[in-house]
Regions:
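Short, conserved beta-turn/loop elements at beta-strand boundaries and strand-helix junctions
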Residues: 7-13, 67-73
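Short glycine/proline-enriched coil/turn segments at helix->beta-strand junctions
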Residues: 33, 80-82
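SH3/SH3-like beta-barrel fold
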Residues: 13-17, 74-79
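Glycine/charge-rich catalytic "coupling/switch" loops of P-loop NTPases
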Residues: 19-68, 75, 87-118
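Conserved hydrophobic positions within beta-strands
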Residues: 4-5, 64
Protein backbone atom coordinates (compact mmCIF):
# COMPACT_ATOMS: atom_id res chain seq x y z
CA UNK A 1 0.00 0.00 0.00
CA UNK A 2 1.39 3.42 -0.94
CA UNK A 3 1.46 5.87 1.95
CA UNK A 4 2.86 9.07 3.37
CA UNK A 5 4.52 9.59 6.75
CA UNK A 6 2.57 11.78 9.15
CA UNK A 7 3.38 13.05 12.62
CA UNK A 8 5.34 11.09 15.21
CA UNK A 9 4.56 11.21 18.92
CA UNK A 10 6.03 9.11 21.69
CA UNK A 11 6.57 5.63 20.33
CA UNK A 12 4.35 5.82 17.24
CA UNK A 13 4.11 7.43 13.82
CA UNK A 14 0.91 8.07 11.89
CA UNK A 15 0.84 6.99 8.24
CA UNK A 16 -1.72 8.13 5.68
CA UNK A 17 -2.84 5.71 2.97
CA UNK A 18 -5.29 7.67 0.86
CA UNK A 19 -7.97 8.83 3.31
CA UNK A 20 -7.03 6.17 5.85
CA UNK A 21 -4.72 7.03 8.75
CA UNK A 22 -3.05 4.24 10.73
CA UNK A 23 -0.57 4.02 13.58
CA UNK A 24 2.83 2.33 13.16
CA UNK A 25 5.90 1.90 15.33
CA UNK A 26 7.84 5.15 15.49
CA UNK A 27 9.57 5.79 12.16
CA UNK A 28 12.79 7.78 11.73
CA UNK A 29 11.37 9.52 8.68
CA UNK A 30 10.18 13.00 7.83
CA UNK A 31 6.50 13.97 7.61
CA UNK A 32 5.39 13.93 3.98
CA UNK A 33 7.92 11.25 2.99
CA UNK A 34 6.45 8.68 0.59
CA UNK A 35 6.57 5.09 1.80
CA UNK A 36 5.14 1.63 1.13
CA UNK A 37 3.18 -0.11 3.89
CA UNK A 38 2.88 -3.89 4.27
CA UNK A 39 0.34 -5.56 6.52
CA UNK A 40 0.09 -9.36 6.49
CA UNK A 41 -3.38 -10.81 5.87
CA UNK A 42 -2.92 -13.13 8.86
CA UNK A 43 -1.98 -10.21 11.15
CA UNK A 44 -5.44 -8.64 10.97
CA UNK A 45 -8.38 -9.50 13.22
CA UNK A 46 -11.79 -9.14 11.61
CA UNK A 47 -14.70 -8.10 13.84
CA UNK A 48 -18.39 -7.82 12.99
CA UNK A 49 -18.94 -5.01 15.52
CA UNK A 50 -16.81 -2.15 16.84
CA UNK A 51 -14.36 -3.63 19.36
CA UNK A 52 -13.54 -1.72 22.54
CA UNK A 53 -10.79 -1.58 25.15
CA UNK A 54 -8.01 -3.11 23.07
CA UNK A 55 -4.26 -2.63 23.14
CA UNK A 56 -4.25 -2.64 19.32
CA UNK A 57 -3.99 0.95 18.08
CA UNK A 58 -5.69 0.44 14.72
CA UNK A 59 -9.42 -0.18 14.28
CA UNK A 60 -10.51 0.43 10.70
CA UNK A 61 -14.09 0.21 9.43
CA UNK A 62 -14.63 -1.23 5.97
CA UNK A 63 -17.00 -3.18 3.74
CA UNK A 64 -16.45 -6.74 2.56
CA UNK A 65 -15.89 -6.51 -1.21
CA UNK A 66 -14.93 -10.14 -1.98
CA UNK A 67 -14.71 -13.51 -0.24
CA UNK A 68 -12.84 -16.55 -1.62
CA UNK A 69 -11.17 -19.69 -0.32
CA UNK A 70 -7.92 -21.42 -1.13
CA UNK A 71 -6.44 -24.55 0.46
CA UNK A 72 -8.83 -24.44 3.42
CA UNK A 73 -8.27 -20.76 4.17
CA UNK A 74 -10.77 -17.99 3.56
CA UNK A 75 -9.70 -14.57 2.33
CA UNK A 76 -11.77 -11.42 2.39
CA UNK A 77 -11.01 -8.24 0.51
CA UNK A 78 -12.21 -5.32 2.60
CA UNK A 79 -12.69 -1.87 1.13
CA UNK A 80 -11.48 0.49 3.84
CA UNK A 81 -10.42 3.24 1.43
CA UNK A 82 -7.55 1.10 0.26
CA UNK A 83 -8.51 -2.52 -0.33
CA UNK A 84 -7.06 -4.77 2.38
CA UNK A 85 -6.88 -8.58 2.28
CA UNK A 86 -7.70 -10.43 5.51
CA UNK A 87 -7.19 -14.15 6.16
CA UNK A 88 -9.77 -15.88 8.36
CA UNK A 89 -10.87 -19.46 9.00
CA UNK A 90 -14.04 -20.99 7.59
CA UNK A 91 -15.39 -21.19 11.17
CA UNK A 92 -14.80 -17.46 11.67
CA UNK A 93 -16.50 -16.69 8.36
CA UNK A 94 -19.55 -18.73 9.39
CA UNK A 95 -19.73 -17.47 12.99
CA UNK A 96 -19.34 -13.81 11.98
CA UNK A 97 -21.64 -14.16 8.97
CA UNK A 98 -19.04 -12.62 6.65
CA UNK A 99 -20.60 -11.93 3.25
CA UNK A 100 -20.03 -9.40 0.48
CA UNK A 101 -21.51 -6.04 1.45
CA UNK A 102 -21.18 -6.51 5.23
CA UNK A 103 -19.57 -3.76 7.27
CA UNK A 104 -16.66 -5.07 9.34
CA UNK A 105 -13.86 -3.74 11.51
CA UNK A 106 -10.20 -4.56 10.95
CA UNK A 107 -8.05 -4.63 14.08
CA UNK A 108 -4.25 -4.69 14.06
CA UNK A 109 -1.35 -3.59 16.21
CA UNK A 110 1.01 -0.79 15.24
CA UNK A 111 3.84 -3.32 15.40
CA UNK A 112 2.14 -5.41 12.67
CA UNK A 113 2.63 -2.63 10.13
CA UNK A 114 5.89 -2.73 8.16
CA UNK A 115 7.11 0.46 6.47
CA UNK A 116 9.52 0.53 3.51
CA UNK A 117 11.06 3.14 1.22
CA UNK A 118 8.83 3.97 -1.75
Amino acid sequence: LDGVIGESTGHSTMVRIGDLEISTRRQNRNPGEKIVVSLGASQIILASSMPQNLSARNIVKGTVAQVWSSDGLVFTQVDAGPKIIVEITENAMTELGVTVGNDVFLVFKSSSVDVFDA
